[in-house]
């Protein structure tokens, strides 16, 4: 029996859930903003070029009509493979308007990774930037379902392939009026909007099928002044988060629903980032945790006028309490706004409410959702400050992994609870805290050791720039906690000094008995999430090379 009082439910939504598909809602919102002359949708910070809502709306509608006339419908899928750019969301919106599923592809994937991703999504059309064309051509040779390749970042045809603009011109009738276009209506619970790549942290990435309903719920959260954004004209957001990732995709679609200006970066540059905060009077900045350690120690921040900055939001991977507090202090902010979600939950389902941040917490349960923490062994629902696996339930949860019912059933139980694989607890104020990944826990002589705790301790040392912890296989103990460490430039430490430093702050089971390996870079995914598998591989290789246990 579940204890109802230990199931935490989100509050009533600030706005009711709107009718219609994600495409219909985006079309309605963007058409409204397009009719306000000069309203800017996107700015590319690198080249200082703007594009208005009118221009964006018109091109997205033209693409929708052209794709429809080409023969695409709710039975088809497209891939968008590009770095962050002014054009990225044009085919995304066009497809959503007519019910074609969009499968964003990581533009830095190699051919093998792209082939795996597209084998799952089975796209008919691929939209790609010029620099990714050759990889897509090589994939097409092995995946003949790809009928057409369209170049996103060229006004004219490129190497014999149509650009988006010539594709549109060749398929639209004379006199086509974008403002007369009506998006398609269909069942938003059954029609897939997006197929996102799962993190792949436990194997090859899987295709996460997200119906239109999930995006519609996300839009409700985006409009919410407590869990989302206050809809204030001329709000400017700075984002360096990859658009192909769920974090970047659904935050940006939410910004378009709200009519915000999105200042994008496709590559992080510290001075450009800070100058953009100042020059564009940015109110909210979106970062992945990889960049927080950098800003915690930056000496450049005070050179810029950041008086308009209201918040910095973090997502995509865990952010330690200490690093978050340090960055908030450097930017003169009361705290860092965090969110927690999985690709399989569409977007964040735990969010720091406006004005209610708590250091180290990832937020409270959002509207339409409920969450619980269960005992790892018995599955019993736990109470306040008790650690177990976080489970969530609500209407943004995926419909399933594409063509993989076994993996779907392993993640979502018969009652609709998604088992996150994250160790968490909630406090007396119903703030949730993520402790570690269930599969990342190190099993030392029967004790469970959380790598995140040791990583946080390591990052507090002034000589350590970055660190990752994993379990080193051991015949006697099961696993030994071990670390990879990047030292601050110009600083020196011995392995023993680091081991002794950690030992002085932890119980005996948590000591770094597997030792320390010095590296130039800690392996991480694109959003800053530590790659435990690669860290473990480095540690095992170092041990085979003669490294002794401590």
Swiss-Prot record:
User: Can you tell which superkingdom this protein's organism belongs to?
Assistant: Eukaryota
Could you cite one Gene Ontology molecular function of this protein?
Answer: CoA-ligase activity
Q: What does this protein do?
A: Produces green light with a wavelength of 562 nm.
- E.C. no: 1.13.12.7
This enzyme catalyses: firefly D-luciferin + ATP + O2 = firefly oxyluciferin + hnu + AMP + CO2 + diphosphate
GO terms for biological process, alphabetical: bioluminescence
Q: Which organism is it from?
A: Photinus pyralis (Common eastern firefly)
Q: By what name is this protein known?
A: Luciferin 4-monooxygenase
Extract the Gene3D superfamilies matched here.
3.30.300.30, 3.40.50.980, Luciferase, Domain 3
Q: Which CDD domains does this UniProt record tie to the protein?
A: Firefly_Luc (cd17642)
Name of the top EC class for this enzyme: oxidoreductase
Family of the protein in this entry: Belongs to the ATP-dependent AMP-binding enzyme family.
Q: Does the keyword Chaperone apply?
A: no
Motif mapping: Microbody targeting signal: 548-550
* Keywords, sorted A to Z: ATP-binding, Luminescence, Magnesium, Metal-binding, Monooxygenase, Nucleotide-binding, Oxidoreductase, Peroxisome, Photoprotein
Tell me the compartments it is located in.
Peroxisome
Which cellular component, as a GO term, is one annotated location? peroxisome
Task: Identify the main location.
Answer: other
Cofactor(s) named in the record: Mg(2+)
Instruction: State whether keyword Cell cycle applies.
Output: no
InterPro entries the record matches? AMP-bd_C, AMP-bd_C_sf, AMP-binding_CS, AMP-dep_synth/lig_dom
